A protein has these predicted regions:
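Positively charged, small/polar-rich N-terminal and surface patches that mediate targeting and assembly
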Residues: 1-87
Length: 87
């Protein structure tokens, strides 16, 4: 299992969340602030099976357009999960 942490622009968050949900991915959405100018961003948390990582990254690529200066679309971390519990 993998934990995907994706930091995206607020402007992209609704479209990305809808696309991930349509792909049957469960998403936790957190409002956050970051970057040099301290602009609002959204942090998405997804727990997925290893075989689903590429599908999530493709959705992020499709739904997060490059910035006006050709800048990054999103910052994505893929972290191994050794244990998962629901209590």
């Amino acid at each position: 299992m993998k934990m995907i942490i994706a930091i995206i622009r607020d402007a992209d968050s609704d479209l990305v969340t809808q696309a991930l949900t349509a792909g049957n991915f469960r998403v936790t959405r957190i409002a956050s602030t970051g970057g040099f100018l301290r602009r609002g961003v959204t942090t998405l948390l997804l727990g997925v099976e290893e075989g689903q990582v590429d599908a999530v990254i493709q959705i992020l690529k499709d739904k997060c357009p490059a910035g006006p200066d050709g800048g990054k679309r999103a910052t994505v971390f893929v972290v191994p999960v050794s244990n998962f519990l629901q209590v």
